[in-house]
UniProtKB/Swiss-Prot annotation:
The keyword DNA-binding does not apply. One of its GO terms (cellular component) is cytoplasm. The keyword Metal-binding does not apply. ATP binds at residues 11-19. It comes from the Bacteria. GO terms for biological process: pyrimidine nucleotide metabolic process. Its EC number is 2.7.4.25. It catalyses: CMP + ATP = CDP + ADP; dCMP + ATP = dCDP + ADP. HAMAP family: Cytidyl_kinase_type1 (MF_00238). Belongs to the cytidylate kinase family. Type 1 subfamily. InterPro entries: Cytidylate_kin (IPR003136), Cytidylate_kinase_dom (IPR011994), P-loop_NTPase (IPR027417). Keywords: ATP-binding, Cytoplasm, Kinase, Nucleotide-binding, Transferase. This is Cytidylate kinase.
């Protein structure tokens, strides 16, 4: 494809975005861009409290960050300053740090520029919270996934268990609810579907059913 083909996949935590985005990337042989990992990586790299830094200090720190995306499908690799981002950014604590960072206009502007730069040269599926509304508004194929809070917490619990990490269901529900509130009510790029997004409630759907629907809708755009 001469012009990069972009698929956007937005939604709150725990709706299955990562799993589905990787499968779609494999299916269509394009790169997988986890923009949530970019926010998490930024928060992890700068550390706790970076959201309270003065504008000049934060600006200088952001200028020192460089994200690169290599590979395709589920083998896509996102790196920050040459370091592959892995499990160290996947804790709930770093997730809350990332949400705090995401409220800062300068951080969102930096991320927007970095993400668009990747999309200018690479066909990809971009997973995040404002991909269809802000980052890639002209993308031909946009999806917004949602699910009940309890179901999302259960999925996160199982994910953490598979990673060998301790988790408490009540605590996860509280953390995800707080994250939802931050994401949906922030002044800059709040979490919401684009007007032309295809909205899919995954609460009572298995992953294969959702995947088949996304493939069907994407193939209509590709063809």
């Amino acid at each position: 494809m001469d012009t990069p083909f972009i698929i956007t996949l937005d939604g709150p935590a725990g709706v299955g975005k990562s799993t589905l985005a990787k499968r779609l990337a494999d299916r269509f042989e394009i790169a997988y861009l986890d923009t949530g990992a970019m926010f998490r990586g930024t928060a992890w790299k700068l550390g706790e409290g970076a959201w309270d830094w003065d504008a000049d200090k934060l600006d200088q720190a952001l200028k020192g960050l460089e994200f690169t995306l290599s590979g395709s499908g589920s083998n896509s690799t996102l790196s920050l300053n040459g370091t592959h981002l892995t499990d160290e950014i996947r804790t709930e604590t770093v997730g809350m740090w990332a949400s705090n960072m995401a409220k800062i206009p300068a951080v969102r502007e930096y991320q927007k520029i970095a993400q668009r730069a990747i999309g200018e040269t690479t066909s990809l599926i971009a997973e995040g919270r404002d991909m269809g509304t802000v980052i890639f508004p002209q993308a031909p194929c946009k999806f917004f996934l949602d699910a009940d809070l309890e179901e999302r917490a259960h999925r996160r619990f199982e994910q953490l268990k598979d990673m060998g990490k301790p988790a408490d269901m009540a605590e996860l529900i509280e953390q995800i609810a707080a994250r939802d509130d931050q994401d949906r009510n922030r002044k800059v790029a709040p979490l919401k579907p684009a007007e032309d997004s295809i909205i899919v409630d995954t609460t009572h759907l298995d992953i294969n059913g959702v995947f088949d629907k996304l493939v069907f809708e994407t193939e209509k755009k590709v063809n």
